[in-house]
Amino acid sequence: FLGTINLSLCEQERDADEEERRDEPNESNVEVEKRFLSGIVGMLGKLFGK
């Protein structure tokens, strides 16, 4: 009985870890997009600000 509970908890942890791994690339892509877009906005601001 305890072995079944332990196995179930391990499976839940593994599923949570897999979900985290799937989320990480998306988060890094969003941060890259934010930096890229802020750079473009900054360049346009300098270009049109002159």
Curated annotation (Swiss-Prot):
Annotated localization: Secreted; Target cell membrane
UniProt cross-references to InterPro entries, sorted A to Z: Frog_antimicrobial_propeptide
GO biological process, one term: killing of cells of another organism
Propeptide, residue positions: 11-35
Main location: secreted
Swiss-Prot/TrEMBL keywords: Amidation, Amphibian defense peptide, Antibiotic, Antimicrobial, Cleavage on pair of basic residues, Cytolysis, Fungicide, Hemolysis, Immunity, Innate immunity, Membrane, Secreted, Signal, Target cell membrane, Target membrane
A Pfam family assignment: FSAP_sig_propep
Signal peptide boundaries: 1-10
GO CC, alphabetical: extracellular region; membrane; other organism cell membrane
Modification sites for Phenylalanine amide: 48
Reported uses of this protein in biotechnology and industry: Attractive candidate as antimicrobial coating agent. When this peptide is covalently grafted to a surface, the adhering bacteria are most probably permeabilized (killed or at least damaged), thus unable to grow.
Claim: Membrane is one of the keywords in the record: yes
Tissue expression from the record: Expressed by the skin glands.
tRNA-binding is among the record's keywords: no
Biological function: Amphipathic alpha-helical antimicrobial peptide with highly potent activity against Gram-positive bacteria, and potent activity Gram-negative bacteria and fungi (MIC=2-30 uM). Acts through membranolytic mechanism involving rapid membrane permeabilization and depolarization. Shows a direct extra-cellular antiviral activity probably through degradation of the viral envelope. Also shows a weak indirect antiviral activity by inhibiting virus replication. Also displays anti-trypanosoma and anti-leishmania (prosmastigotes and axenic amastigotes) activity through membranolytic mechanism.
Family membership noted in the UniProt record: Belongs to the frog skin active peptide (FSAP) family. Temporin subfamily.
Protein name in the entry: Temporin-SHa
Lineage: Eukaryota, Metazoa, Chordata, Craniata, Vertebrata
